[in-house]
């Protein structure tokens, strides 16, 4: 689909209508706050409705959807100040305590030597580390943390494209035999290296990929270096993919263009699954991209995160979020105390979208109410700059192109399968800057 481009008059009329519906402020205001119930194109929660959309509710249950476990996960800050890491990665072995020069080597060693459930810490000295990092299912709780003063000082980087062939993937990811059959993450690499299709697809395009529970990242940057080296077409290029439960990111930067952060639920065979919870907490971080750059099926809370939409690749469309939550699951993505911004190509243009549902797996059937994924997302207590479409901030669904339809009925069911589940509450929208 393509974005709608209004003439100056039409844009003014649309803005006037949405402002009237959302609080009566005039277009000359510096900002406005959408208010309940909003419009069909921009639905807004009431204070009572918003009461259930908190981290406590999102993280209340783990385990299987059919048999949820009320474990009430409460993430605590990732404290590495007193950690003496047994594994230290640096540009030169033996310098500044570096035990390894490759993050994957350190991960492999940690998994072989610590098969239990005691948390293992891997310290990354300042530098740029070129290559993938794969953490397999069943790994012990693992924390990778940068030792620099800022996350920009520790960078994990590689250029991977969903459209590349398995042969090109093998040459890019494993040119010197970094992955071997006896390695813990060999099966992850091999599943992508031996794909039968012409391309590796999105599922194999991640620079860093963890299938394990209790995985943590702190104070580092992960970048898929494909960035603007490709055209504005379809080039999924995941920086970070997580599939496990109780994942935490703190003071992390994720950089790419299309599909930057894949916060997902899958099985060991790299297949999408619809039977269990995968929870993630992302705090004090920065995520950059252009199309669907935060997407997936996990239950994820983003707290004090800046989402920055960029125009440098020349994409005709821009979407921040693309959740594909199971329709029977009440909680998908929650964005709180955060900022949604754009670069100079978008700021003031009001043409990027906050997001769209991802009707994953429904290309042939179209959206089937109650069967197809129906992405769930709430943006609350956050600021949205002038990069984003004022009257129509949500796009038609990915995969099916299902038109966005918000529920503004006085007696609405927030999980009605005949409507989208993309909401706002207490957002501040900047009209110009």
UniProtKB/Swiss-Prot annotation:
Membrane-spanning segments: none
InterPro entries assigned: Pectin_lyas_fold, Pectin_lyase_fold/virulence, Pectinest_B, Pectinesterase_Asp_AS, Pectinesterase_cat
Gene Ontology CC terms, in alphabetical order: cell outer membrane
Sequence ranges on the Periplasmic membrane side: 22-433
This protein's UniProt keywords: Aspartyl esterase, Cell outer membrane, Hydrolase, Lipoprotein, Membrane, Palmitate, Signal
Temperature dependence: Optimum temperature is 40 degrees Celsius.
Domain of life: Bacteria
Organism: Dickeya dadantii (strain 3937)
EC numbers: 3.1.1.11
Membrane topology value: Lipid-anchor
Enzyme class, first EC level, given as a word: hydrolase
Example GO biological process: pectin metabolic process
Functional description taken from the UniProt entry: Probably involved in the degradation of methylated oligogalacturonides present in the periplasm. More active on methylated oligogalacturides than on pectin.
Gene designation: pemB
Catalytic activity: [(1->4)-alpha-D-galacturonosyl methyl ester](n) + n H2O = [(1->4)-alpha-D-galacturonosyl](n) + n methanol + n H(+)
Molecular function as annotated in GO: pectinesterase activity
Protein name, as recorded: Pectinesterase B
Induction section of the entry: By polygalacturonates and galacturonate. Repressed by kdgR.
Broad class of where this protein is predominantly found: membrane
């Amino acid at each position: 689909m393509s974005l709608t481009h209004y003439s100056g008059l039409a844009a003014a009329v649309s803005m006037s209508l949405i402002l009237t519906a959302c609080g009566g402020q005039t277009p000359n205001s510096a900002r406005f706050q959408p208010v309940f119930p909003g419009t069909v194109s921009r639905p807004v929660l009431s204070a009572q409705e918003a009461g259930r959309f908190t981290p406590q509710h999102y993280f209340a249950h783990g385990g299987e959807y059919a048999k949820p476990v009320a474990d009430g996960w409460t993430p605590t800050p990732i404290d590495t100040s007193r950690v003496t890491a047994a594994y230290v990665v640096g540009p030169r072995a033996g310098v500044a305590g570096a035990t390894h020069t490759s993050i994957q080597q350190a991960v492999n060693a940690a998994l072989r030597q610590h098969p239990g459930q005691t948390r293992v810490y891997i310290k990354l000295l300042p530098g740029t580390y070129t290559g993938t990092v794969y953490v397999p299912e069943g790994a012990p709780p693992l924390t990778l943390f940068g030792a620099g003063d800022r996350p920009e000082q520790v960078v994990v980087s590689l250029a991977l494209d969903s459209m590349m062939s398995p042969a090109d993937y093998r040459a890019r990811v494993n040119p010197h035999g970094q992955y071997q059959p006896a390695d813990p993450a060999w099966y992850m690499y091999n599943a992508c290296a031996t794909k039968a299709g012409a391309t590796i697809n999105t599922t194999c395009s991640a620079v860093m990929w963890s299938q394990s529970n209790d995985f943590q990242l702190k104070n580092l940057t992960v970048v898929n270096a494909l960035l603007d080296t490709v055209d504005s077409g379809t080039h999924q290029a995941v920086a970070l993919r997580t599939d496990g439960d109780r994942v935490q990111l703190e003071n992390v930067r994720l950089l790419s263009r299309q599909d930057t952060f894949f916060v997902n639920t899958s099985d060991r065979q790299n297949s999408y699954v619809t039977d269990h919870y995968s929870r993630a907490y992302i705090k004090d971080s920065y995520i950059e991209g252009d199309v669907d750059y935060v997407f997936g099926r996990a239950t994820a809370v983003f707290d004090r995160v800046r989402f920055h939409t960029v125009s440098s690749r020349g994409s005709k469309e821009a979407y921040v979020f693309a959740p594909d939550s199971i329709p029977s699951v009440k909680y998908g993505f929650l964005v709180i105390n955060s900022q949604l911004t754009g670069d100079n190509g978008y700021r003031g243009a009001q043409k990027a979208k906050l997001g769209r549902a991802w009707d994953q797996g429904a290309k042939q059937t179209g959206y089937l109410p109650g069967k197809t994924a129906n992405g769930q997302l709430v943006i609350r207590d956050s600021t949205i700059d002038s990069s984003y479409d004022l009257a129509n901030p949500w796009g038609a669904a990915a995969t099916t192109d299902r038109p966005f339809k918000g529920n503004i009925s006085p007696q609405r069911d927030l999980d009605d399968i005949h409507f989208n589940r993309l909401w706002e509450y207490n957002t501040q929208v900047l009209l110009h800057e």
